[in-house]
């Protein structure tokens, strides 16, 4: 039987693009681990992706995961859009390169053999874990220490 894990994530950007951060909570049998990191120049979508990636990469064995995010971009991207992106060589329906492809590939790899249920929660609506992740992400964004090497400014 797989371990049942809950993950809650959020990303934040002070300006978009601008300094950003992510926050994540990983919960297993009443134990919690939090993750957060701030980046000097990034976007909100990149931080939403990073929150999910970091939490999933922290799992040491195959798990049954319920991952809650307030990002439709992440939830729809990983459950719907990614299949066609991969078929098209990481291009959109308009034959343009997929934005944030470095992180989409990393998230795809982080899924591994996990069984994941993706849950969308409304942001800033009083969901306790989402609010905590938002606080972690905002605090990290206010004190960025990392450079987002994959961020590419729009041409």
UniProtKB/Swiss-Prot annotation:
Domain named RNase H type-1: residues: 1-142
Residues engaged in binding Mg(2+) 2: 10, 134
What UniProt keywords apply to this chain's record, in alphabetical order? Cytoplasm, Endonuclease, Hydrolase, Magnesium, Metal-binding, Nuclease
- Give the reaction(s) catalysed: Endonucleolytic cleavage to 5'-phosphomonoester
Could you tell me which CDD domains the record lists for this protein?
Answer: RNase_HI_prokaryote_like (cd09278)
* Molecular functions (GO terms): magnesium ion binding; nucleic acid binding; RNA-DNA hybrid ribonuclease activity
Name the Gene3D superfamilies on file.
Ribonuclease H-like superfamily/Ribonuclease H
This protein's superkingdom?
Bacteria
Cofactor(s) for this UniProt protein? Mg(2+)
Question: What the protein does?
Answer: Endonuclease that specifically degrades the RNA of RNA-DNA hybrids.
Please describe the quaternary structure of this protein: Monomer.
Q: What is this protein called?
A: Ribonuclease H
The species this protein was found in: Salmonella paratyphi C (strain RKS4594)
**Gene of this entry:** rnhA
